[in-house]
Amino acid sequence: MTHAMHMTGGQALARQLALEGLRDIFCVPGVQLDWAVDGIREMGDAFRLLIPRHEQATSYMADGYARASGRIGVCMTVPGPGLTNAMAGLSTAYACSSPLLSITGQIHSSTIGAGYGMLHEIKGQSDLIGSVTKWHGLATAPNQVPGLVREAVTRLRSGRPQPVGIEIPHDVLSSAADIELVPPPLGADGRLAPAAEQVSAAAALLAHARFPVIHAGGGVLAADASAALETLAERLQAPVITTETSRGAISDLHPMAVNSVAGRALIRHADVVLVVGSRFMNRMAPSPQWTSATTQFIYLNVEAEAAAPPRKPGLLIQADARLGLEALARAVPAARTPRMGIVEAARGWAAQQIREVEPQFAYVQALRRAIPEDGFLINELTQVGYLSTIAYPLYHPRTLITPGYQGTLGFGFPTALGVAAAMPDRAVVCITGDGGFGWGMQELATARRYGLNMVVVVFNDGHFGNVRLLQQQTFGHTIGVELCNPDFSKLADAFGVRSAVASSPDEMESALRDALARGGPSLLEVRVGPMPSAWHLIGYNSIFKRPSPEPADPVADLLAP
């Protein structure tokens, strides 16, 4: 039990954050945040305040921090332009179900919505925050601050782990009152247990399935459910398809693990599909089109909306992914028919197609050889990056971090800084393009200032490469895709960051190994030319048409009745 103490709203914010165990904060300070930042200063070693050079990096860094560690990432910005600068990172965290707490300053509480032209005023700021959070709240008095933070953390630790936001006007932060902190409850983890009748019905479907398939999404990672996923897959002898944001939820060394290319060949034959922690949507079409008309579905998700149209109707288990998978593993009998041969045939068929995408495949292989098994790859939108989502082998959860369906250019480098801040003893490598790196190259200063242990690999082709590919295929010509780049080695040197240049996969591998061995921040420029598209393999056939691979169905004979 706590007792009321006389303090400012800024002090209350800092002390409640400390009580919640939220130590690391990514922030660009400003006048509306002065009392909050000073409250943090008073707490000394209770906090680590990391200051990037642009507010965009505050939310990206908090996202990377959260996704790598599973802990809550915290970013803090001034209102108006500070918030809008952070929106790209917030929208990415929302798309990728990242547990992020956004703290935003506000103009004087008496003038909100009045349109007086106050410093950093923005019309409808609360609505803007609401568009990229699952919950948000506003404090209008200092004594509301601890309860608002407590509610935000409760929301973050229950349900789908998307961002939440709180707004605190600067007069609320600077005003003093008798304020009581709100201790977190002991032993509460917020996990939703499955209903027994839902588990029984799903287990019966799976037990009688001729060929069950598991489609695992990012909710498996969020729930730390990898072990439970493997156990159920082994009992059912069911292949596990992972999505871009869930890769690593099951090790690629596991005999039941398949990437999405092999998965599309398998799922068309499934009579029962268990969808776990996934939106199960095609990014470029209104509904998934991968299964047969007779396929039955089980949706295991903490949100009921995950089973709603346009998805096909099915049985819903509304529960935490780990608890649901554990319950199913206890309820289903062990499969009598091994299916590893079927899975291996699909994997080989997919690997053959992936190997044909060069030179990207050679670069992906070089990355995997250079990065330790438990190292992190932060993957941005480059031609090498696109192929990496299906071709880069993963052995541990959370070790591939992507922008998900938001597809945010400029995501990679600042997000990797957050990963490095969260996991200082693990290798962190970001791959980005010369286009995307331009969004945040000033954060080389942040990497140097905090000695963050990471390498940014910049693939330099002098263009917005994917835009060029799309324009050329669609129109037969290009416009607005050429870039005027700096000398990246001189740029790195100006910030006091080591650099190297490579022009081949082997050179890149050697330079990357050296950079990782040295530790600290490094920039590695890889000079490349135009590359073919890999989009036909990652599900965007409506954009990039390619002939169907042969055989068109690699497992039909193995699954014949």
PLM region spans:
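N-terminal alpha/beta PP-like core and its mobile active-site loop of ThDP/TPP-dependent enzymes
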Residues: T2-V332, A370-E373, N453-V456, A492, ...
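Conserved structured core elements
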Residues: G30, A223, R264, A319-R322, ...
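Short glycine/proline- and acidic residue-enriched helix-loop micro-motifs
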Residues: S131-L138, P185, V343-V357, F495
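Thiamine diphosphate
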Residues: T111, G115-H120, I267, A308-P310, ...
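Active-site-proximal loop/turn and secondary-structure-junction residues that shape catalytic pockets
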Residues: H170-V172, Q383, V528
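Phosphate/pyrophosphate-binding active-site segments
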Residues: M1-A4, N143, I179-L181, A293-L381, ...
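Active-site diphosphate/adenylate-binding microenvironment
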Residues: G10-A14, A18-R23, V31-R41, V343-D425
